[in-house]
Amino acid sequence: MALLQIAEPGQSSAPHQHKLAAGIDLGTTNSLVASVRSGTASTLVDSQGRSILPSVVNYGADATRVGYPAREQAETDPHNTVISVKRLLGRSLQDINQRYPHLPYRFKASEKGLPIVQTAQGDKNPIQISADILKALAERATATLGGELAGVVITVPAYFDDAQRVATKDAAALAGLHVLRLLNEPTAAAIAYGLDSGQEGVIAVYDLGGGTFDISILRLSRGVFEVLATGGDSALGGDDFDHLIADHLQAQIGLTSLTAEQQRALINAATQAKIDLTEYMTAELNVLGWQGSLTREELENLIAPLLKKTLLSCRRALKDAGVEADEVLEVVMVGGSTRTPFVREQVGEFFGRTPLTSINPDEVVAIGAAIQADILAGNKPDAEMLLLDVIPLSLGIETMGGLVEKIIPRNTTIPVARAQEFTTFKDGQTAMSVHVVQGEREMVDDCRSLARFSLKGIPPMAAGAAHIRVTYQVDADGLLSVTALEKSTGVQAEIQVKPSYGLSDDEVTQMLKDSMAYAKEDMLARALAEQRVEADRVIEGLVSALQADGDELLNEQERQTLLQAIERLIELRNGDNADAIEQGIKDTDKASQDFASRRMDKSIRSALAGHSVDEI
């Protein structure tokens, strides 16, 4: 059975053409870049030997600073220093204000309601800010590797939605990077440990970073990772450990209130104590004129409630995944906070096995991304990692007006299943034709037809009342199954096709080029088709209503006014001006409002006929 085409269009896999590629962990608190050199994946360091780049950007009046120099400006220049921009990616300003009401930035909304940070250098959106972090990482990689990057793999949380993933890719494009793939962070961690070539089964990835906690339950089947469930807490991380220790120290010192400088000094001391206690049983402290110590046991008592919260999230994720803790084969630890021995002990006890900790937990995600990038760049043509199988072109369905509704976007890793609900267009419709297409264009005529089948036995209902759930499922062998199910009766039909059969790399490349070349033209054609479909719906509905109730509820003049509105809309519908059709629909709706109200009153009277007030 032929697999889906898994090579990127135009990619060369010739062994002598070694390409420079990198894996990027674009993190909430810190970011890293890694690459495979001499067959080994490792993180790339800056001029001072540091692999970590703080995910902080300062837009000062004099310069843009990224990383450590930017972090130093956080206290003195908070309005122009953006920390944890990853939290803002792909979100509306309204959403951000609800989730993070205490951010120090000066926000304003774009025309589409997206957040814009007002800085000394002008307006900056989250994509631009993320791009500056990516540029800094790319410059480090270029300097270290001695050449331009052919492509990168960027990791994202497994729970990132489409908007957040698109925003991440846009940021990379703005940074001048070619994205080979977006890779789920837990999958990257599993790849770093070589679990993709190990025993099949369930893997847990416990990710406790500086500001967030994520738990992911994965299933490895035939070399392909499937995300079964995710969970966590976007406001719980190692920073919270530091604050608990700082509060404890404040109580020990006997201070009731603190200046900002004292608070920062306590936090720094707390962070250092936490680090020391990963190796020693006691940490000595000298802060704000106070000398004392903190034991590992005291630390464990302080952080136990937070750790319990993470384990509750693990329990929920296992329940969502439908698996028991003892079914988990391996537990991968990610994030600097998992260095704490108590964290490792508690997680090990919960899952009943020793977690994997041999790879630096700060670096494990970037290393996994680097391994994936090396393969995608064509440097390992014989690699057997089936995780590379992707949908080469989007899979969609034809809707009214010859439009394409994409169900599974291109570059989605397989296996995958996606479902969407559709409804009937006409009153009394008892069958629906399902047309499966492949391609990136907006209109069916410009895409490749894969299959057609019919769903029959839909109960006669008013247009829009039926609920038909269409599911697209692509298995690890690239076999597409399409199922259509009418929800009220359970009637269903299905078909199986091989979506990539008969397409060469050149044909795929050409289809992608066409989608870009005709993008504007396609969107205009789609807008016109959508307005025509809506006009048809309005015309058909109004004609049907006039036939049913026009004689009873309208006088001749009112009837003629509506008929003229319908004729005008039909004339506009047959034209090529989408805006004119849209206005015609609005005018027709306005002209028919009184008629619609009378029909509603009639329906209510009919429903109440023969019933007393007490019955109602």
From Swiss-Prot:
<protein>
    <recommendedName>
        <fullName>Chaperone protein HscA homolog</fullName>
    </recommendedName>
</protein>
<dbReference type="GO" id="GO:0016887">
    <property type="term" value="F:ATP hydrolysis activity"/>
</dbReference>
<dbReference type="GO" id="GO:0051085">
    <property type="term" value="P:chaperone cofactor-dependent protein refolding"/>
</dbReference>
<comment type="similarity">
    <text>Belongs to the heat shock protein 70 family.</text>
</comment>
<dbReference type="InterPro" id="IPR043129">
    <property type="entry name" value="ATPase_NBD"/>
</dbReference>
<dbReference type="GO" id="GO:0005829">
    <property type="term" value="C:cytosol"/>
</dbReference>
<dbReference type="Pfam" id="PF00012">
    <property type="entry name" value="HSP70"/>
</dbReference>
<dbReference type="InterPro" id="IPR029048">
    <property type="entry name" value="HSP70_C_sf"/>
</dbReference>
<dbReference type="InterPro" id="IPR042039">
    <property type="entry name" value="HscA_NBD"/>
</dbReference>
<dbReference type="InterPro" id="IPR010236">
    <property type="entry name" value="ISC_FeS_clus_asmbl_HscA"/>
</dbReference>
<dbReference type="GO" id="GO:0051082">
    <property type="term" value="F:unfolded protein binding"/>
</dbReference>
<comment type="function">
    <text>Probable chaperone. Has a low intrinsic ATPase activity which is markedly stimulated by HscB.</text>
</comment>
<keyword id="KW-0067">ATP-binding</keyword>
<dbReference type="GO" id="GO:0044183">
    <property type="term" value="F:protein folding chaperone"/>
</dbReference>
<dbReference type="GO" id="GO:0140662">
    <property type="term" value="F:ATP-dependent protein folding chaperone"/>
</dbReference>
<dbReference type="GO" id="GO:0031072">
    <property type="term" value="F:heat shock protein binding"/>
</dbReference>
<dbReference type="InterPro" id="IPR018181">
    <property type="entry name" value="Heat_shock_70_CS"/>
</dbReference>
<keyword id="KW-0143">Chaperone</keyword>
<dbReference type="InterPro" id="IPR013126">
    <property type="entry name" value="Hsp_70_fam"/>
</dbReference>
<keyword id="KW-0547">Nucleotide-binding</keyword>
<dbReference type="GO" id="GO:0016226">
    <property type="term" value="P:iron-sulfur cluster assembly"/>
</dbReference>
<dbReference type="InterPro" id="IPR029047">
    <property type="entry name" value="HSP70_peptide-bd_sf"/>
</dbReference>
<dbReference type="GO" id="GO:0005524">
    <property type="term" value="F:ATP binding"/>
</dbReference>
<dbReference type="GO" id="GO:0042026">
    <property type="term" value="P:protein refolding"/>
</dbReference>
